[in-house]
Amino acid sequence: MGNDGISRIGYARSSDGFQIDERLTNPVFEPNQEIEKNGCEDPRLTLIDNELFMTYTALTERDHWQLYQIALTSIKASDFIAKNWNWKERVLPFRGIRNKDAVIFPRKINNKYVMLHRFDPDLCITYSDELRRWYDIRSVFGPRHNSWDAWKIGAAGTPIELNEGWLCIYHGVSYEKEYSLGVVMLDKDNPEKILSRSEKPILKPTKDYELYGKVPNVVFSCGNVQVDDKVLIYYGGADSVLCVASYELNELIPKK
């Protein structure tokens, strides 16, 4: 976010997943239409057949009322690697409806593309034949009373396919407005079916850079990478710094 208060999306590269080797000075993606004039934020990237699909939150304000919508675009993986920012058409799956925290599964399930997103207060699922028109919106799970995720929830990074099912990292917010991360395991063939869900968060704000900042008491993730038997979770600390946490896969699989 710049001094003008508008969110834009940048690019940074790491060879080992921890140290930043390169960070571009200018944005690689920024608002170019009315529905996102106040920002493009919370990008989530999914690679499908040599195409990188990016969901993000398109933000605008009308008469002091904030409208956030999920938006979708894509870029060829070869262009992304070459830093040719030839983004394709920007699509609003649910135009005019407040919605956010969207992420696409990395392959078709039952011949359909699948996306998680949040219609308040639940984390929902929806389907598409061609990544443009989405339908069959259904709730998968919602906040839990008197829990670390009691106020609201939302998807984090791209679901990870394991033999056991789809491992999905998500954020949950407590009544005290503390943002933490948890995990849920969804069935491989029917991702509307929950196999297990973590009772406690896997990551919560404890460090100074997570407790104090632009928005205090926040760990918020939009991306994760599986490297062999480890998962690197990239997250924002207090909406001010970029962080990474490393986990063994077996640490993340919630008990039934």
For the regions a language model picked out, list residue spans one by one.
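Structural signature of WD-repeat beta-propeller blades
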Residues: 41, 102, 157, 220-222
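Beta-rich carbohydrate-recognition and catalytic domains
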Residues: 1-38, 47-151, 160-214, 228-256
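Electrostatic interaction modules used in gene-expression and signaling proteins
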Residues: 224-226
